[in-house]
Amino acid sequence: MKSNDYTIASLKEKVREMNQAELIDFFEEESRSGALKVKQARVKQIAQETQAIHEYEQMLEYERRYNGKVVCGIDEVGRGPLAGPVIACAVILNDGHHYIGLNDSKQLSKHKRASLYDALTQSVTYAIGAASVEEIDKFNIYEATKLAMHRAIDKLPVKPDVLLIDAMNLNTGLIEESIIKGDAKSVSIAAASVIAKVYRDHLMEEIHEEFPYYDFNRNAGYGTKRHLDGLMQYGITAHHRKSFEPIKSMIKTEENAKTITKPS
């Protein structure tokens, strides 16, 4: 049967799994404009799927350098926010992994991140490491980030041979590759980026339930207008980084020196 044997409404489902060659054969006798639009939509989708597969293959470059070794990707989220911990994730991908569309978490929609997070956490070996607000203020954000990464590695149930790290040197004694913009160049680092991002977002949503003044459920602790307005009106919480501006300057004034412990 050809496309002109079907109603236009039923064509979308019919062509959903067709490849390019099958489409050409299926639509060879078609003249209806609506049906041809369905064909073009599927052609475009195939092109996008092909491109995504190509990009995924390119992002396997570093992993393939260490074929036969246990490769771990490491990334962090939360270096820039005014509140909340910095979170690191260490990921060892499963054999035969195929997470098409995986990329730097910042480049993905919230829906896509959530979908990949569910798929990854059900399949890969991973561990989360955190450095607290107190540690960030004590050591600085760079050192706290390294601390979180070390903790993630130490919590892995499998010892890796190779660490692929997003722009960081950890001096673990293992083989390390520090990759600039690694979350867009390595699938292992990208996977760590996604898991860390979704994990931290959930954590900030929980903090928002306790302290709703700062819009943490939307800004993840970053200095948005609503967050800054909340700081000016209510002061700081124990979750705020006192070494970060403008909080550092705010706590020098008597009116903002008190840390709120719960909503009023």
UniProtKB/Swiss-Prot annotation:
Function text: Endonuclease that specifically degrades the RNA of RNA-DNA hybrids.
Gene Ontology MF term list: manganese ion binding; RNA binding; RNA-DNA hybrid ribonuclease activity
Record keyword Isomerase present: no
Binding site for a divalent metal cation: D75, E76, D166
Top-level division of the source organism's lineage: Bacteria
GO cellular component: cytoplasm; ribonuclease H2 complex
Protein family membership: Belongs to the RNase HII family.
EC number(s) stated in the UniProt entry for this protein: 3.1.26.4
Localization annotation: Cytoplasm
RNase H type-2 domain sequence ranges: 69-263
Primary localization class, coarse: cytoplasm
PROSITE patterns: RNASE_H_2
One GO BP: DNA replication, removal of RNA primer
One Pfam match: RNase_HII
Cofactor descriptive note: Manganese or magnesium. Binds 1 divalent metal ion per monomer in the absence of substrate. May bind a second metal ion after substrate binding.
InterPro entries reported for this sequence: RNase_HII, RNase_HII/HIII, RNase_HII/HIII_dom, RNaseH-like_sf, RNaseH_sf
Gene (name only): rnhB
Catalytic reactions of this protein: Endonucleolytic cleavage to 5'-phosphomonoester
Required co-factors: Mn(2+); Mg(2+)
The entry's keywords: Cytoplasm, Endonuclease, Hydrolase, Manganese, Metal-binding, Nuclease
Protein name: Ribonuclease HII
Keyword GTP-binding in record: no
